[in-house]
Amino acid sequence: MEIDLAGATIALEGASNPVVEAALAALRVNDGRLVEGIQAQRADILLISCPLRPGVTAENPSTLYAVARKMAVAMTEHGSGRIVFLLSATACMPMRRHPRFSMENASILAGMRTLAMEFGPKVLVNAVGVGAVEDETMVSGDKAMLSHTPVGRAGSIEEAVAAVLFFCDPLNTYTTGQMLGVDGGWMAGYGRNF
């Protein structure tokens, strides 16, 4: 997917994983510029990376919310911005085998939606809910999810990255407070068996 970021600055908050690394690479290819330190406080786009697999220690959802809110205030002051949360699809469909992980992601999703309400129209705040994604190994989700995924396969890193690019695209000016599930249809109800 190609978009024109026209030199927009991008800040990253959270853990590294193959999906976020590929998203950052794609944003740079599309004329985005990664900034760190003091420059990150005035970034045009904030990408917040949450753990995508159960068992990975997550940052406190309240801490992530506070970071995102602080950036939203700064973005509002300089006129506009985008915040994209990269989180697990369990934010919308909890897994019985992973209650804490599901609750943490649902909490982050609720925080994302409150930020969208508070800071619109200047700041667009959205999330990409990643289901089972594999490279050589499971990058996101749980292998058990695959038996309940209507498309019958794991997703690719590139498919998750395309959703991030959609939310960052300057032509996308009307979407906020949404989570786009990149999960092969898992959230359509199949998760209840977990």
Language model features with spans:
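Canonical Rossmann dinucleotide-binding motif of NAD(H)/NADP(H)-dependent dehydrogenases/reductases
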Residues: 1-35
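A glycine-rich helix->loop->beta "capping" turn
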Residues: 5, 31-60, 124
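Catalytic loop of short-chain dehydrogenase/reductase
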Residues: 49-67, 73-77, 82-120, 132-133
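Short, small/polar-rich loop/turn modules that mediate ligand/substrate recognition or access, typified
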Residues: 120-124, 175-177
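Conserved SDR Rossmann-fold cofactor-binding beta-strand/turn motif
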Residues: 124-134, 168, 183
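A conserved structural motif in NAD(P)-dependent oxidoreductases
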Residues: 149-160
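Short C-terminal tail/terminal secondary-structure segment
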Residues: 165, 176-194
